[in-house]
Amino acid sequence: NDSKEPWQVFSAEDRAKILETDRPTYVTVLDCNHSFKEGTDEPQGGLKYRGPMYFDWDAKDGIVAVMDSVREFMEMLESLTFDVSQARWYLSGSRGVHCEIPQECFMDPRIIAAGVGNLHLAYKRFAFEHITPYLDMRVYTGKRGRQWRTTCNNRGTEDNPRYKVAITADQLREITDEEMYKELCKTPCHSVEVTPPTLNRQLKVEVQVALDDNKLRVRKNSK
């Protein structure tokens, strides 16, 4: 049962190893510089986050409507001269699609290494500015953050398996009906070849504007 898995804290550097050996159903989508264990104080300088800009589409209206929305979002990214093959795309296994854009596509390495305060709010702002139907805005939470389903475990039954699966941008564009979606989700696929990330200046500007706007709001609210 997904809900019975206990909260555990691991080093961000061990993420890949934990996914391979422990096979958790969920992990936090962002790394954080605080364990949130009872009795521990927040780090001096506040909470800092690191991780991809993430998006989650989900609908009860059927996968065709969701796929149209995702393709619209992909076209928006391409209008920013972003190569969508640099993003990681997933079928959630239940009428949904996940997208992760590597932080290296819009931030300098030294900033990524140091961590960024309120990173989830900058991602939320970007999602709001470019929202398409069925994009879930509830996933942008702080502190422990969003629990992100992994590709490790079957969320269906033995006779009717349903996995979250990795998929390429080109494959995603070819899904035209629910049967194609379900067929792809029957077999585990943990990763696909992704184009190495390169810095996209338009994405960088948009995320930085979102971060600056949030800092301004925090300063105004503190007065």
Residue ranges and their predicted role:
Residues N1-R95, I101-E129, K215-L216, K220:
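Signature for HUH/AEP ssDNA processing cores
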Residues S35-R50, L121-K223:
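C-terminal accessory nucleic-acid interaction domains of nucleic acid-metabolism proteins
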Residues G96-H98, T157-E158:
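Flexible loop/turn segments at secondary-structure boundaries
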